[in-house]
Amino acid sequence: MSATLELTEALIACHSVTPADGGCQDLIAKRLQAIGFHTESVVSGPENFQVTNLWAIKKGKAGDQGKVLMFAGHTDVVPTGPLEKWTSDPFTPTIRDGMLYGRGAADMKTSLAAFVVATEEFVTMHPDHQGAIAFLITSDEEGPANDGTVIMCERLQKHQQRLDYCVIGEPTSVDQLGDMIKNGRRGSLSGKLKIKGIQAHIAYPHLGKNPIHLSAPAITALVETEWDKGNEYFQPTSFQMSNIHAGTGANNVIPGELTIDFNFRFSTESKPEQLRERLESILKNAGLDFEINWVLGGSPFITGDGDLAGALRKAIKTETQIDTELSTTGGTSDGRFIAKICKEVVEFGPLNVTSHKIDECVIVDDVVPLKNIYRKTLEQLIA
Protein backbone atom coordinates (compact mmCIF):
# COMPACT_ATOMS: atom_id res chain seq x y z
CA MET A 1 0.00 0.00 0.00
CA SER A 2 1.35 3.44 -0.93
CA ALA A 3 2.07 6.02 1.76
CA THR A 4 -0.61 8.29 0.30
CA LEU A 5 -3.29 5.61 0.33
CA GLU A 6 -2.33 4.60 3.87
CA LEU A 7 -2.66 8.19 5.13
CA THR A 8 -5.92 8.66 3.23
CA GLU A 9 -7.38 5.64 4.99
CA ALA A 10 -6.21 6.93 8.38
CA LEU A 11 -7.93 10.27 7.72
CA ILE A 12 -11.17 8.67 6.52
CA ALA A 13 -11.26 6.63 9.75
CA CYS A 14 -11.46 9.87 11.74
CA HIS A 15 -15.08 10.84 12.50
CA SER A 16 -15.00 14.48 11.43
CA VAL A 17 -18.49 15.72 10.59
CA THR A 18 -18.50 19.54 10.75
CA PRO A 19 -17.23 21.09 12.99
CA ALA A 20 -15.39 18.05 14.37
CA ASP A 21 -11.86 17.37 13.17
CA GLY A 22 -11.73 13.89 14.68
CA GLY A 23 -7.95 13.91 15.07
CA CYS A 24 -7.16 14.49 11.38
CA GLN A 25 -5.14 17.63 11.99
CA ASP A 26 -3.06 15.96 14.69
CA LEU A 27 -2.10 13.26 12.19
CA ILE A 28 -1.17 15.88 9.61
CA ALA A 29 0.68 18.12 12.07
CA LYS A 30 2.87 15.27 13.35
CA ARG A 31 3.87 14.33 9.82
CA LEU A 32 4.74 17.93 9.00
CA GLN A 33 6.62 18.53 12.25
CA ALA A 34 8.79 15.50 11.45
CA ILE A 35 10.08 17.24 8.31
CA GLY A 36 10.75 20.62 9.89
CA PHE A 37 7.44 22.46 9.82
CA HIS A 38 6.38 24.94 12.49
CA THR A 39 2.73 24.18 13.28
CA GLU A 40 0.05 26.07 15.16
CA SER A 41 -3.43 24.88 16.13
CA VAL A 42 -6.15 27.51 16.47
CA VAL A 43 -9.50 26.64 18.06
CA SER A 44 -12.35 29.03 17.38
CA GLY A 45 -16.12 29.32 17.61
CA PRO A 46 -18.73 29.04 20.38
CA GLU A 47 -18.68 26.16 22.86
CA ASN A 48 -21.34 24.26 20.95
CA PHE A 49 -19.50 24.65 17.62
CA GLN A 50 -15.77 24.39 18.26
CA VAL A 51 -13.72 24.60 15.07
CA THR A 52 -10.13 23.38 14.78
CA ASN A 53 -7.71 25.07 12.39
CA LEU A 54 -4.12 24.17 11.52
CA TRP A 55 -1.44 26.52 10.23
CA ALA A 56 1.92 25.06 9.27
CA ILE A 57 4.93 26.53 7.46
CA LYS A 58 8.45 25.52 6.49
CA LYS A 59 10.64 28.27 5.11
CA GLY A 60 13.15 27.67 2.36
CA LYS A 61 16.77 28.74 1.89
CA ALA A 62 15.66 32.09 0.50
CA GLY A 63 13.97 32.93 3.81
CA ASP A 64 11.44 35.73 3.65
CA GLN A 65 12.52 36.51 0.09
CA GLY A 66 11.38 33.14 -1.24
CA LYS A 67 8.05 32.40 -2.84
CA VAL A 68 5.39 30.83 -0.61
CA LEU A 69 3.15 28.02 -1.86
CA MET A 70 0.27 27.07 0.44
CA PHE A 71 -1.80 23.90 0.36
CA ALA A 72 -5.29 24.53 1.74
CA GLY A 73 -8.22 22.31 2.57
CA HIS A 74 -10.63 20.98 5.15
CA THR A 75 -10.79 17.93 7.38
CA ASP A 76 -14.53 18.18 8.08
CA VAL A 77 -17.02 16.15 6.08
CA VAL A 78 -20.77 16.31 5.53
CA PRO A 79 -23.08 13.97 7.49
CA THR A 80 -23.29 10.40 6.24
CA GLY A 81 -27.02 10.22 5.68
CA PRO A 82 -28.77 6.90 6.38
CA LEU A 83 -26.08 4.40 7.39
CA GLU A 84 -28.14 1.48 6.11
CA LYS A 85 -27.81 2.84 2.58
CA TRP A 86 -24.01 2.61 2.65
CA THR A 87 -22.49 -0.60 1.29
CA SER A 88 -19.81 -0.38 4.00
CA ASP A 89 -19.36 1.78 7.10
CA PRO A 90 -18.58 5.36 5.96
CA PHE A 91 -15.79 5.75 8.52
CA THR A 92 -14.23 2.37 7.83
CA PRO A 93 -12.12 2.90 4.69
CA THR A 94 -12.88 0.02 2.36
CA ILE A 95 -11.39 -0.93 -1.01
CA ARG A 96 -13.74 -2.67 -3.44
CA ASP A 97 -13.32 -3.15 -7.17
CA GLY A 98 -10.51 -0.61 -7.42
CA MET A 99 -12.36 2.10 -5.45
CA LEU A 100 -11.65 3.44 -1.96
CA TYR A 101 -14.94 4.04 -0.14
CA GLY A 102 -15.56 6.28 2.86
CA ARG A 103 -17.00 9.64 3.83
CA GLY A 104 -14.54 12.30 2.75
CA ALA A 105 -12.71 10.06 0.27
CA ALA A 106 -13.37 12.53 -2.55
CA ASP A 107 -14.06 15.66 -0.50
CA MET A 108 -11.31 15.96 0.52
CA LYS A 109 -9.21 13.58 2.59
CA THR A 110 -7.43 12.03 -0.40
CA SER A 111 -6.19 15.48 -1.40
CA LEU A 112 -5.01 16.18 2.15
CA ALA A 113 -3.04 12.93 2.25
CA ALA A 114 -1.59 13.68 -1.19
CA PHE A 115 -0.55 17.17 -0.01
CA VAL A 116 1.33 15.71 2.96
CA VAL A 117 3.12 12.89 1.15
CA ALA A 118 3.96 15.13 -1.81
CA THR A 119 5.53 17.58 0.63
CA GLU A 120 7.46 14.82 2.42
CA GLU A 121 8.88 13.60 -0.89
CA PHE A 122 9.67 17.12 -2.05
CA VAL A 123 11.57 18.01 1.13
CA THR A 124 13.56 14.76 0.91
CA MET A 125 14.39 15.27 -2.77
CA HIS A 126 15.04 19.01 -2.45
CA PRO A 127 16.47 19.66 1.05
CA ASP A 128 17.76 23.05 -0.09
CA HIS A 129 14.47 24.23 -1.58
CA GLN A 130 14.36 28.00 -1.98
CA GLY A 131 10.70 28.78 -1.37
CA ALA A 132 8.43 28.11 1.58
CA ILE A 133 5.64 25.55 1.90
CA ALA A 134 2.58 26.26 4.04
CA PHE A 135 -0.61 24.44 5.03
CA LEU A 136 -3.95 25.94 6.08
CA ILE A 137 -6.46 23.30 7.16
CA THR A 138 -9.86 23.84 8.80
CA SER A 139 -12.74 21.77 10.17
CA ASP A 140 -15.34 24.39 9.19
CA GLU A 141 -15.69 24.37 5.41
CA GLU A 142 -18.77 22.22 4.96
CA GLY A 143 -20.68 24.21 7.61
CA PRO A 144 -21.26 27.93 8.12
CA ALA A 145 -17.54 28.66 7.50
CA ASN A 146 -17.51 31.46 10.07
CA ASP A 147 -14.66 30.17 12.23
CA GLY A 148 -12.41 28.44 9.74
CA THR A 149 -10.44 29.68 6.76
CA VAL A 150 -11.90 33.17 6.99
CA ILE A 151 -10.50 33.86 10.47
CA MET A 152 -7.21 32.16 9.64
CA CYS A 153 -6.79 34.44 6.63
CA GLU A 154 -7.47 37.43 8.86
CA ARG A 155 -4.75 36.21 11.25
CA LEU A 156 -2.28 35.71 8.42
CA GLN A 157 -3.03 39.18 7.10
CA LYS A 158 -2.56 40.66 10.57
CA HIS A 159 0.84 38.96 10.84
CA GLN A 160 1.72 40.14 7.31
CA GLN A 161 2.25 36.61 6.06
CA ARG A 162 2.87 36.78 2.33
CA LEU A 163 1.31 34.10 0.13
CA ASP A 164 2.20 33.79 -3.54
CA TYR A 165 0.46 30.58 -4.57
CA CYS A 166 -2.34 28.47 -3.12
CA VAL A 167 -3.59 25.06 -4.20
CA ILE A 168 -6.90 24.01 -2.63
CA GLY A 169 -7.57 20.28 -2.72
CA GLU A 170 -11.24 20.40 -3.70
CA PRO A 171 -12.33 17.55 -6.00
CA THR A 172 -12.38 19.27 -9.39
CA SER A 173 -11.86 16.45 -11.88
CA VAL A 174 -14.92 15.49 -13.91
CA ASP A 175 -14.38 12.36 -16.01
CA GLN A 176 -10.74 11.54 -15.28
CA LEU A 177 -8.06 12.80 -12.94
CA GLY A 178 -6.60 16.04 -14.24
CA ASP A 179 -9.25 17.09 -16.73
CA MET A 180 -10.29 20.24 -14.84
CA ILE A 181 -8.72 22.91 -12.63
CA LYS A 182 -10.85 25.56 -10.96
CA ASN A 183 -8.99 28.84 -11.43
CA GLY A 184 -11.75 30.96 -9.95
CA ARG A 185 -15.25 30.89 -8.53
CA ARG A 186 -18.37 32.96 -9.00
CA GLY A 187 -19.58 35.21 -6.23
CA SER A 188 -22.72 34.42 -4.21
CA LEU A 189 -25.26 37.04 -3.17
CA SER A 190 -28.45 35.89 -1.45
CA GLY A 191 -31.55 37.70 -0.31
CA LYS A 192 -34.79 37.16 1.57
CA LEU A 193 -37.48 39.32 -0.01
CA LYS A 194 -40.72 40.19 1.79
CA ILE A 195 -43.47 41.70 -0.34
CA LYS A 196 -46.24 43.25 1.73
CA GLY A 197 -49.93 43.03 0.91
CA ILE A 198 -53.13 43.29 2.93
CA GLN A 199 -54.73 40.15 4.34
CA ALA A 200 -58.45 39.78 3.69
CA HIS A 201 -61.24 37.27 3.10
CA ILE A 202 -60.74 35.71 -0.31
CA ALA A 203 -64.39 36.48 -1.20
CA TYR A 204 -63.72 40.22 -0.75
CA PRO A 205 -60.59 40.90 -2.82
CA HIS A 206 -61.36 44.63 -2.93
CA LEU A 207 -60.63 44.75 0.81
CA GLY A 208 -57.17 43.24 0.48
CA LYS A 209 -53.99 43.37 -1.58
CA ASN A 210 -52.74 40.01 -2.78
CA PRO A 211 -48.91 40.08 -2.77
CA ILE A 212 -48.79 36.99 -4.99
CA HIS A 213 -50.71 38.75 -7.74
CA LEU A 214 -48.89 42.05 -7.20
CA SER A 215 -45.46 40.45 -7.45
CA ALA A 216 -46.07 38.39 -10.59
CA PRO A 217 -44.89 41.05 -13.11
CA ALA A 218 -41.77 41.76 -11.05
CA ILE A 219 -40.94 38.06 -10.76
CA THR A 220 -41.24 37.72 -14.53
CA ALA A 221 -38.96 40.72 -15.02
CA LEU A 222 -36.36 39.34 -12.61
CA VAL A 223 -36.33 35.96 -14.34
CA GLU A 224 -36.02 37.52 -17.81
CA THR A 225 -33.32 40.07 -16.94
CA GLU A 226 -29.85 39.61 -18.43
CA TRP A 227 -27.64 40.69 -15.53
CA ASP A 228 -24.42 40.54 -17.53
CA LYS A 229 -22.89 38.63 -20.43
CA GLY A 230 -20.07 36.98 -18.50
CA ASN A 231 -16.54 36.97 -19.93
CA GLU A 232 -13.78 34.60 -21.02
CA TYR A 233 -13.54 33.16 -17.50
CA PHE A 234 -17.14 33.32 -16.23
CA GLN A 235 -20.54 32.36 -17.54
CA PRO A 236 -23.20 35.10 -17.26
CA THR A 237 -24.52 35.96 -13.81
CA SER A 238 -27.54 33.85 -12.87
CA PHE A 239 -30.56 34.69 -10.72
CA GLN A 240 -32.52 31.87 -9.11
CA MET A 241 -35.39 31.72 -6.62
CA SER A 242 -35.16 28.82 -4.17
CA ASN A 243 -38.23 29.24 -1.94
CA ILE A 244 -41.56 31.07 -2.16
CA HIS A 245 -44.09 31.19 0.66
CA ALA A 246 -47.33 33.05 1.28
CA GLY A 247 -50.57 32.49 3.12
CA THR A 248 -51.77 30.90 6.32
CA GLY A 249 -52.53 27.48 4.86
CA ALA A 250 -56.24 28.28 4.70
CA ASN A 251 -57.79 28.45 1.23
CA ASN A 252 -60.13 31.34 2.00
CA VAL A 253 -57.59 33.99 3.08
CA ILE A 254 -55.73 36.45 0.86
CA PRO A 255 -52.16 36.42 2.22
CA GLY A 256 -50.77 39.53 3.82
CA GLU A 257 -47.18 38.82 2.87
CA LEU A 258 -45.11 36.94 0.30
CA THR A 259 -41.58 35.74 1.09
CA ILE A 260 -39.04 34.79 -1.59
CA ASP A 261 -35.54 33.41 -1.04
CA PHE A 262 -33.26 34.05 -4.00
CA ASN A 263 -29.61 33.91 -5.00
CA PHE A 264 -27.25 35.46 -7.53
CA ARG A 265 -24.19 33.55 -8.69
CA PHE A 266 -22.29 36.42 -10.22
CA SER A 267 -19.27 36.97 -12.41
CA THR A 268 -16.59 39.62 -12.23
CA GLU A 269 -18.70 41.62 -14.69
CA SER A 270 -21.14 42.53 -11.89
CA LYS A 271 -20.64 43.98 -8.44
CA PRO A 272 -22.92 43.16 -5.47
CA GLU A 273 -24.10 46.75 -5.14
CA GLN A 274 -25.04 46.85 -8.83
CA LEU A 275 -27.11 43.69 -8.52
CA ARG A 276 -28.85 45.01 -5.40
CA GLU A 277 -29.67 48.31 -7.08
CA ARG A 278 -31.00 46.69 -10.26
CA LEU A 279 -33.18 44.19 -8.40
CA GLU A 280 -34.61 46.82 -6.08
CA SER A 281 -35.27 49.10 -9.05
CA ILE A 282 -37.36 46.38 -10.71
CA LEU A 283 -39.39 45.94 -7.52
CA LYS A 284 -39.90 49.69 -7.12
CA ASN A 285 -40.97 50.09 -10.75
CA ALA A 286 -43.59 47.40 -10.11
CA GLY A 287 -45.00 49.52 -7.28
CA LEU A 288 -44.30 46.93 -4.59
CA ASP A 289 -44.03 47.55 -0.86
CA PHE A 290 -41.06 45.38 0.10
CA GLU A 291 -38.05 44.82 2.31
CA ILE A 292 -34.94 42.71 1.65
CA ASN A 293 -32.34 41.13 3.89
CA TRP A 294 -29.13 40.74 1.85
CA VAL A 295 -26.26 38.31 2.54
CA LEU A 296 -23.03 38.39 0.54
CA GLY A 297 -21.62 34.87 0.66
CA GLY A 298 -18.47 35.71 -1.26
CA SER A 299 -17.11 37.76 -4.11
CA PRO A 300 -15.89 36.21 -7.36
CA PHE A 301 -12.18 35.62 -7.82
CA ILE A 302 -10.07 34.63 -10.78
CA THR A 303 -6.49 33.49 -11.29
CA GLY A 304 -5.37 33.90 -14.86
CA ASP A 305 -3.25 31.36 -16.70
CA GLY A 306 -0.12 32.48 -14.83
CA ASP A 307 2.73 30.76 -12.99
CA LEU A 308 0.60 28.59 -10.69
CA ALA A 309 -1.96 27.45 -13.25
CA GLY A 310 0.84 26.90 -15.75
CA ALA A 311 2.89 24.78 -13.35
CA LEU A 312 -0.13 22.71 -12.34
CA ARG A 313 -1.17 22.17 -15.95
CA LYS A 314 2.35 21.05 -16.84
CA ALA A 315 2.44 18.66 -13.87
CA ILE A 316 -0.92 17.18 -14.89
CA LYS A 317 0.23 16.78 -18.49
CA THR A 318 3.45 15.04 -17.40
CA GLU A 319 1.63 12.67 -15.04
CA THR A 320 -1.57 11.92 -16.98
CA GLN A 321 -0.95 13.11 -20.58
CA ILE A 322 -4.14 15.19 -20.26
CA ASP A 323 -4.57 18.79 -21.45
CA THR A 324 -6.56 20.18 -18.56
CA GLU A 325 -9.38 22.72 -18.72
CA LEU A 326 -9.54 25.88 -16.63
CA SER A 327 -13.04 26.48 -15.24
CA THR A 328 -14.94 28.70 -12.80
CA THR A 329 -18.14 26.64 -12.70
CA GLY A 330 -19.70 25.24 -9.54
CA GLY A 331 -20.38 26.60 -6.08
CA THR A 332 -18.34 28.70 -3.70
CA SER A 333 -15.29 27.46 -1.80
CA ASP A 334 -12.84 28.74 0.79
CA GLY A 335 -10.92 30.16 -2.14
CA ARG A 336 -13.10 33.25 -1.77
CA PHE A 337 -11.33 34.02 1.51
CA ILE A 338 -7.83 33.02 0.44
CA ALA A 339 -7.98 35.07 -2.77
CA LYS A 340 -8.07 38.23 -0.65
CA ILE A 341 -4.55 37.58 0.66
CA CYS A 342 -2.96 35.38 -2.01
CA LYS A 343 -1.98 36.39 -5.53
CA GLU A 344 -2.76 33.12 -7.31
CA VAL A 345 -5.36 30.59 -6.12
CA VAL A 346 -6.47 27.41 -7.87
CA GLU A 347 -8.37 24.29 -6.87
CA PHE A 348 -7.42 20.81 -7.99
CA GLY A 349 -8.23 17.34 -6.76
CA PRO A 350 -9.78 13.95 -7.59
CA LEU A 351 -13.09 13.18 -9.28
CA ASN A 352 -16.07 15.05 -7.87
CA VAL A 353 -18.82 12.67 -8.99
CA THR A 354 -19.44 11.05 -5.57
CA SER A 355 -18.80 14.01 -3.26
CA HIS A 356 -21.42 14.23 -0.47
CA LYS A 357 -23.13 11.08 -1.79
CA ILE A 358 -23.84 7.69 -0.25
CA ASP A 359 -20.84 5.41 -0.96
CA GLU A 360 -18.49 8.34 -1.61
CA CYS A 361 -15.28 7.05 -3.18
CA VAL A 362 -12.11 7.70 -5.16
CA ILE A 363 -10.30 5.59 -7.73
CA VAL A 364 -7.40 3.87 -5.96
CA ASP A 365 -5.18 4.21 -9.03
CA ASP A 366 -5.67 8.02 -8.93
CA VAL A 367 -4.22 8.44 -5.44
CA VAL A 368 -0.50 8.26 -6.26
CA PRO A 369 -0.77 10.27 -9.51
CA LEU A 370 -2.57 13.02 -7.55
CA LYS A 371 0.31 13.10 -5.06
CA ASN A 372 2.83 13.23 -7.92
CA ILE A 373 1.03 16.18 -9.52
CA TYR A 374 1.18 18.15 -6.27
CA ARG A 375 4.90 17.33 -5.83
CA LYS A 376 5.74 18.30 -9.41
CA THR A 377 3.94 21.60 -8.90
CA LEU A 378 6.11 22.29 -5.85
CA GLU A 379 9.23 21.42 -7.85
CA GLN A 380 8.43 23.93 -10.57
CA LEU A 381 7.59 26.83 -8.27
CA ILE A 382 9.74 26.72 -5.12
CA ALA A 383 12.60 24.23 -5.61
Swiss-Prot record:
**A Pfam family in this protein?**
M20_dimer
For this protein, the record's PROSITE patterns field holds: ARGE_DAPE_CPG2_1
Q: In which pathway does it act?
A: Amino-acid biosynthesis; L-lysine biosynthesis via DAP pathway; LL-2,6-diaminopimelate from (S)-tetrahydrodipicolinate (succinylase route): step 3/3
Active site annotation, chain numbering: 76, 141 (proton acceptor)
Q: Which cofactor does it need?
A: Zn(2+); Co(2+)
Which EC class heads this enzyme's classification? hydrolase
Q: Per the UniProt entry, what are the Gene Ontology biological process annotations, in alphabetical order?
A: diaminopimelate biosynthetic process; L-arginine biosynthetic process; lysine biosynthetic process via diaminopimelate
Gene Ontology MF terms in the entry = acetylornithine deacetylase activity; cobalt ion binding; succinyl-diaminopimelate desuccinylase activity; zinc ion binding
Protein name as catalogued: Succinyl-diaminopimelate desuccinylase
Species per Swiss-Prot/TrEMBL record: Polynucleobacter asymbioticus (strain DSM 18221 / CIP 109841 / QLW-P1DMWA-1) (Polynucleobacter necessarius subsp. asymbioticus)
